[in-house]
């Protein structure tokens, strides 16, 4: 059976890991410091991580490692060039958060465009009630109609943002 090590289980919250645990000799750690990585992975054939860094020197010191599963979309925590050089397969979970991230992007963009945080503070802080003015001109009030905006990057998330917009 494959020796599987999950270095940062905390990152998945209360997700049920029982299907993964059935695939081999499984050991999971809530968190793993950079000083603990090598010791915890020394016999692993499969390493699962989310944020834990797996740099060149670490990968070179793990002769049994065959596969790294990144429990995230980003892959910048693993030295991909060295992994490829060593024949270690690496896979992320591309696409799992595309809709959520695109929706959050639109939410934040609209909030910035409409000065939501500023006006929220202005009203809740009592400034509006304390003034005799009907209108407040401290920040611009913009309309979406007729506005144009651009999307920087047309990967899966960028395309979804453009589609939703």
Predicted regions and their residues:
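N-terminal glycine-/charge-rich "phosphate-binding" loop or analogous flexible N-terminal tail
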Residues: 1-44
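Rossmann-like dinucleotide/phosphate-binding beta-alpha-beta segment
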Residues: 19, 135-165
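Short beta->alpha connector loops at strand-helix junctions that form conserved
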Residues: 30, 71-72, 88-99
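A short, aliphatic-rich alpha-helical micro-motif
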Residues: 40-41, 59-62, 144
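Rossmann-fold NAD(P) dinucleotide-binding segment
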Residues: 53-65, 80
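Rossmann-fold NAD(P)-binding glycine/threonine-rich loop
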Residues: 76-86
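Phosphate-binding beta-alpha-beta segment of Rossmann-like dinucleotide-binding domains, i.e.
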Residues: 86, 94-148
